[in-house]
């Protein structure tokens, strides 16, 4: 496979003869200066192929024209061993990556080179440039369809749109990656579509675990994995979301298939852009981010659209540094999404998984015209009950729940039961917990929440509602608990 890499990353042979040839004049980490003595300079965002002594080409992307004969480029792999004077060939266009059916079940890097020790890609595999304009506005789909996930708290409070963008915001260790994995599982179970996963700046161990899990679960044959991991240069982490999006666009445009695009983690894309900006000598903006932060985020997000009746649905994990939701990177990403799923560290500490905050999370789809009046009403009542409970928590911690009025005690009891009912075991965690995953239809979620709000479960143990699927399952658990109690406990005092 190694011998095939230069051919995969090089431009078409017939164009190579006319492309300018240059030489490396300076190497500063991932930043390379290249001089071209003759011919026109490569354009901004064009690819360069640099020949190295070990025979493995380095792909770089032009970022600036320094003078009439020199460009500054950003390397997409390590420049260790690169020397001044190394020959450089301009590719004549942006980086192109392989797309199509041959990519299903494969793991590739930012330049499209397979990294799964599999067979080489077949000759004639189509290629597309990673820099593309969004589809014309007139061709973009405007119909709103709900993307049912089977996850109760998401379907109830932050419904996702098929063809829309949803982001999962949370700090370290609150369950973002597990939630993304469960959504991949839901896509395979519920929708006959393609999944494209972009691993952006995450740990190599997590990437290997995901590849292994997908092989064992049977998900891999309908999935493309695109990795730019934590140990790779910032240029690779900066461009890998565009590679994944290009693969997804091909299935949407040419194969007319619905695509689920998952990115973990979009914050690392922004972080890599900040590194690149610093390497290129640009003045930083707020909190040290690149001055082009909003432009870079928009350039990625505005390409994620539906065309006609074929959709690209994006689910993005977003790391929140120091749990600060006012961070410029977080706010820039949030401006582009339809649904904000906020993961709470305090809920994770209480074991309320998925640790989704029902108050801070929101969705533009939670509208009676989209989800229906009954759904919207139940969601509002659930939020109102949980919010009232939170307002009383300080009083409860100081004086105890017994000091509350009868109405407040009733609301607190129902809010606690709602919080527990909205937890559920996931299929992707079954190997660790031993509890089979549950996928719950929206109708069952609404029926369960309505019953709790109406007081039908006021005399139930809270534990009966914890980590279940439907209310029927909770009812069986409650009945089993009551049957297991000694007779004396049932007797009147």
Curated annotation (Swiss-Prot):
Catalysed reaction, written as an equation: ATP + H2O + 4 H(+)(in) = ADP + phosphate + 5 H(+)(out)
CDD domains per UniProt: ATP-synt_F1_beta_C, ATP-synt_F1_beta_N, F1-ATPase_beta_CD
PROSITE patterns: ATPASE_ALPHA_BETA
Region of interest: Disordered: 113-138
Keywords: ATP synthesis, ATP-binding, Cell inner membrane, Cell membrane, CF(1), Hydrogen ion transport, Ion transport, Membrane, Nucleotide-binding, Translocase, Transport
Keyword Membrane among UniProt keywords: yes
Superkingdom of the source species: Bacteria
GO cellular component terms given for this protein: plasma membrane; proton-transporting ATP synthase complex
Compartment(s) of residence: Cell inner membrane
Database matches in SMART domains: AAA
Main location: membrane
Binding site for ATP: 170-177
Membrane topology: Peripheral membrane protein
Top-rank EC class of the record's enzyme: translocase
EC number: 7.1.2.2
GO terms for MF: ATP binding; ATP hydrolysis activity; proton-transporting ATP synthase activity, rotational mechanism
Similarity field: Belongs to the ATPase alpha/beta chains family.
Function: Produces ATP from ADP in the presence of a proton gradient across the membrane. The catalytic sites are hosted primarily by the beta subunits.
Complexes and interactors: F-type ATPases have 2 components, CF(1) - the catalytic core - and CF(0) - the membrane proton channel. CF(1) has five subunits: alpha(3), beta(3), gamma(1), delta(1), epsilon(1). CF(0) has three main subunits: a(1), b(2) and c(9-12). The alpha and beta chains form an alternating ring which encloses part of the gamma chain. CF(1) is attached to CF(0) by a central stalk formed by the gamma and epsilon chains, while a peripheral stalk is formed by the delta and b chains.
Name under which the protein is recorded: ATP synthase subunit beta 3
The organism of origin for this protein: Paraburkholderia xenovorans (strain LB400)
Recorded name of the encoding gene: atpD3
